[in-house]
Amino acid sequence: MTGNAPDLPAFAALARAHDALLYVDDAHGFGVIGDRDGYEPGPFGRSGNAIVRYFGESYDHVVLTAGFSKAYSSLLAFVACPTPLKRYLKTMVPSYIYSGPVPVASLATALLGLEVNRRRGDDLRAQLWHRTRTLLDQLDKLGVATSNTSGFPLVELALANAEDLDAVGRHLFDRGIYVTLAPYPVVPRREAGFRVQLTAANTAEQSTIS
């Protein structure tokens, strides 16, 4: 819930050293962060092809799962993994074998989202970084602590009294601000609070604290 990425290269190196598989759930990173090769327009990288490429890693000994529900607003998910493992999963994993086809509407939404990503995704990612940076800088000036040190667009704010969480959520919602509540056991007891998720569609005014 912190909005920070783990030290993926260290975990990947450990997995390869012991011939193990590293399972990575990149629910929020897919579509937002990606390749960094010196040509990207902003700190989030380019292409939005997820955290493995963001850190310049390969899929050797790595299994990545990600979904389209965050960046693409579509009911779709996928697994990226080494080819031999892919063959095994397609024939041996019940959750895949007994699953049905993707709803056509969800598939159409995902395809259109990928086209938007191809055409102007890097510009949207750069804009998202600026919106996030604006919010984080203002919180810092106000002395409001957040665990976000990466600059990624997930900003978690802890409350001094966890019992106020629901009331705070309602207070913000009534004022047109939707946040995700993070109670225990989703987070440790002392870190209960809420999470602000910014998008490229947020305006400069919406990411400014007034």
Regions found by a protein language model. Name each.
Residues 1-19, 34, 163-166, 205:
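Active-site core of PLP-dependent enzymes with the aminotransferase class I/II
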Residues 29:
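Residues immediately C-terminal
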Residues 35-88:
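Active-site PLP attachment segment
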Residues 41, 47-48, 135, 175, ...:
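Membrane-embedded alpha-helical bundles of multi-pass transporters/translocases
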Residues 63, 75-76, 93-102:
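A short glycine-threonine-serine/GTX helix/turn-capping micro-motif
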Residues 65-66, 99-100, 145-150:
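Short beta-strand
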Residues 122-136, 140-176, 186, 190-194, ...:
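Conserved PLP-binding catalytic core of the aspartate aminotransferase-like
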